[in-house]
């Protein structure tokens, strides 16, 4: 279930907000310029569904998002627990970074956790199927796939280069709860 936990960025043991209420999540994230919406991801993906199949299944949604936001490129990231590169992928995304581009993600399968650092706080957003999140360019953040990742997200960009991260070198991600610690 979609879950927002807010911490002071200096104290991961102190919880300032903990909610699974979609409206409260959207309102809290809106306060830091992040768009969060619940959409419908009605298409079940086959085990072998590749980027082409995923984009074909969600073509109308992707086109609408790209037209509305002036986005130029799209791709799909799909990671399963048996992915041989899962550990290195996790480490790459766990490093705090920013982008020159908005980070727009529509989750169509599984779940993962965004950690957004803004105004002295860390916003941990566990996104799952049906969640759309748009993180503004320049927002300091990291993403945790979990130790046994299972998610598929459509990624939409204004830049034709796609995902380009600018790493901060800060080890803040090592101090906050990892995604696999998410209570069910």
Swiss-Prot record:
Cofactor note: Binds 1 Fe(2+) cation per monomer. Binds 1 nickel ion per monomer.
GO biological process, one term: L-methionine salvage from S-adenosylmethionine
Database matches in Gene3D superfamilies: Jelly Rolls
Site residues, May play a role in transmitting local conformational changes: 102
Molecular function terms from GO: acireductone dioxygenase (Ni2+-requiring) activity; acireductone dioxygenase [iron(II)-requiring] activity; iron ion binding; nickel cation binding
UniProt site positions, description: Important to generate the dianion: 105
Swiss-Prot/TrEMBL catalytic activity: 1,2-dihydroxy-5-(methylsulfanyl)pent-1-en-3-one + O2 = 3-(methylsulfanyl)propanoate + CO + formate + 2 H(+); 1,2-dihydroxy-5-(methylsulfanyl)pent-1-en-3-one + O2 = 4-methylsulfanyl-2-oxobutanoate + formate + 2 H(+)
Protein name: Acireductone dioxygenase
Species this chain originates from: Parvibaculum lavamentivorans (strain DS-1 / DSM 13023 / NCIMB 13966)
